[in-house]
Amino acid sequence: MASETVSNHQEKALALLQADAEKILRLIKVQMDNLTMPQCPLYEEVLDTQMFGLSREVDFAVRLGLIGEEQGKAMLGELERELSALHEAFTNKQQ
């Protein structure tokens, strides 16, 4: 019973983290579609704040043992790659 509860908590934690990551990914995709980052510094600030918040959530879940450290790193790494692609796309547009 206890292991079932732990497993349930782990699944819920992962689902919540993935939902938050998906929200950030949608923000990134909107920026990619519009490539308006410098015209909207507030949007970039929101992305940075959301990424920081998610990193804290992931750290907390890892410390509780709800997700593995590698799982958390992979989730954040994917979003960081998307952000990097956004910055690269905008830089290429400016050239």
From Swiss-Prot:
Alphabetized HAMAP family for the sequence: UPF0358
Annotated family: Belongs to the UPF0358 family.
Protein name: UPF0358 protein BcerKBAB4_3775
Gene3D superfamilies, A to Z: SO2669-like
Cited Pfam families: DUF1507
InterPro entries: UPF0358, UPF0358_sf
